[in-house]
Amino acid sequence: MNQPLAMTLTQKAPIISRSLGAVVVVALMILPFLALLPAENPLAISTYTLTLIGKILCYAVVAIALDLVWGYAGLLSLGHGLFFALGGYAMGMYLMRQAAGDGLPAFMSFLSWSELPWFWSGSQHFAWALCLIVLVPGLLALIFGYFAFRSKIKGVYFSIMTQALTYAGMLLFFRNETGFGGNNGFTGFTTMLGFPVSATSTRIALFLATLVLLIASLALGFALARTKFGRVLTAVRDAENRLTFCGYDPKGFKLFVWTLSAVLCALAGALYVPQVGIINPSEMSPTNSIEAAIWVALGGRGTLIGPVLGAGIVNGAKSWFTMAMPEYWQFFLGLIFILVTLFLPKGVIGLLKRGREK
């Protein structure tokens, strides 16, 4: 039974690697404050750059969440885009209520609605929004996972079911009568906790909150990898039948990490929305969930750090390609997946580890 690569890297990582990680964290903590510098200052960064990096950090959290279920438990989910979007919609409901004040959100007025739907009750309160962000995706993952794992669904069938769930969610949210803005979704946010969303200081706070979530997700992942729980998850991935013969019930372990992964995605989605200023059903597109799997594969499954690198590499390249050669972006993404499958089965982290051993 193979030991989790994340645990191996953590135990054997030289001091210089840990120091490099600390330098990166400090640099990311300093980075948002460069947006406060005058535009003529060579160190100044634009609000666009700050938002772009904040988006990538949100995606990095999604990559960690997916790595927990795919890299450790061996469950390839193609539905994490749904949990990400649900967290974003929960935050969007709060932001829309803040923008509307005592009235109805703009899209409801446009559709001639006379009152808020029942499920919007309390959405003007930030504390309730936080509850929705955690509980709605968490409960959905818990219910779906309970029936899927009880039925012993795994492999490609599990992947297909998660993608079908995401696609169904996207179709549901596209409908105007569901009360979530239809095709346009939520936009036009003005304030958050009384602060202007577009203010640079608010952007900095959101960036730092995303960074804290990323660090906490990594810390939680590494902590799990070092415990008996992490070793059992790896056994679920490598030899589930043998684990069952040893007296363990894999369903509980898979259900816990599946639900935890969904909640992490939702928190990332909640921080994503106020930074980009919009949430719509396209975030639930099956291609987004497939793209997240590419981040993990490129960085290296079961490493936690690798998926963070993969998310950064792919989304950084995507930003450049969509500006320089937008018509070729999908070809580039497909090429990455093919090359990683053929030449980097253990991802970038596996390549670095192999080079260090030589």
For each of these PLM feature ranges, what is it?
Residues 1-358:
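Transmembrane alpha-helices and adjacent helix-loop boundaries
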